[in-house]
Amino acid sequence: MKFLFGLLLVSSFAFADCPQLYPDHKPFNIPNTTELCNSFYVSDYDTINHKVIAVSELLKHNFPVGSVKRTNNFHSDDRVGSVPNNRQYLKTHYDKGHMAPADDASSLEEMKETFLLTNMTPQSPTLNRVEWKLLEEKVRGIFDSSKTDVYVVTIAVYENKQTINGLPIPSGYWKIVYADNSQYFFYADNNDDAVVVQRGSVALPSLFK
């Protein structure tokens, strides 16, 4: 499968600690980010502005995705220090919204990794609990019917430069699914009135602001 977004690609000679977790095994070319490798997903994290830019998941064919009980144990990521942390989300309007969903985990270790705060963004509660949750279920349905491994890329778009308690707030999200040589594109704004929209091949907005 070919990763369409040239904006996100680097040359085949670029270094990556976990290239197998990216579509086409090619890391994202996102300035000022640190690659945080986990068991089944990798997060490209901006350690200067304390925000996750993109997450790529590898859902292995025939793995028991979605079979692990949810833990809800949100915790800081020692690889980037004490920020972000749970205190920053206290008394805000926002949920801790997963980039790589907890329900995509197929083991206890994977479940634990999905609750790293480097896998979170401040997300509208309505979007997180309704529209985005339905999209995540739709993606797992695509995976369940797939005959091959599936890659899922989730991108947080930061167009408004808004923050809360030092946490940058995404203006919206893309989710791109690569399954059986097909590609599925979804987008939603990050607000309580948002609706997830499925699109064809698209020109992405600027991702790196």
Write out the residue ranges for each language-model feature.
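Domain-level detector of nuclease and nuclease-like folds
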Residues: 78-209
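Sec-dependent N-terminal signal peptides
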Residues: 3-13
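Boundary at the C-terminal end of the N-terminal hydrophobic targeting segment
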Residues: 14-16, 23
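Short Gly/Pro-enriched turn/cap motifs at secondary-structure boundaries
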Residues: 31-34, 165-167
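Short alpha-helical segments and helix-capping/turn motifs at coil-helix boundaries
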Residues: 25-30, 38-42, 138, 172
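Short, His- and charge-rich active-site/binding loops that engage polyanionic ligands
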Residues: 34-95
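Coil-to-beta-strand transition motifs
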Residues: 19-20, 36-38, 47-54, 169-171, ...
